[in-house]
Amino acid sequence: ARTPCSLGVTAEKALIARHIPCPAFKVRPALRVTAQGELVPGQEPEKPWPGHAGRIDPEYKGYPTGVLEVHPSQEIQKLATVNAETVDTPLDSGSPVELPENTFRILDLGTNLSGFLGATITCSSPVTVYLAFDEILTRNDVHWARMGCAQFVPYYLAPGTYQVESFEPYTMRYVKVMAVGGACTIEHAYLREYVYPDAYEATFASSDPRLATLFEAGRETFVQNGTDVFMDCPSRERAGWLCDS
């Protein structure tokens, strides 16, 4: 059914000229599976991560835990990782990654990237899929709360095939895909970059390969931190804090 609503017309505005190119959105596929294992739901964590629900007040604002229909950061903490093993399975373009019920796989993007995390997810029964991520591995695992924020995206899926992509840009190299309460298949896992485009026109050559590595690292740092202004960082705080940048 259609619901009528009132619309308003926004007056035309004289916008400031951008003077810089629009970002590039190249799709970077996950390159390999680096770890796999099982999940045990319903386990209380030894050191619970409180998140920000305890800081809700008239100044901080937000939604208290009691009024939330779902509380993903509390739910994901009750998943215990067991029987984890290191693997090294290359991913060809579009090759499927099977996840039986209550299992995980860790995907490697090859380097730290900033942008929108996406994949094609297929399931034949209801399943909750968590895409948790971080820039590094901590004891061969993805520690999604390491940066003091909830670095994961949950999907509560009915049977079907879904093409999902995060609404906000994040920074990551490793992605821990978790299938809880059901099985699923992941295909075409990727990160859609959100970066400054013109830095790729620069070239560098040296007889010392270490210098070339440093140059490429500097280029990656710049394109991710300078989509339009020099930002504090491309992950937690995408803002132009001048004293930091």
Residue ranges and their predicted role:
Residues A1-R236, G240-D244:
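Extracellular/oxidizing-compartment recognition motifs
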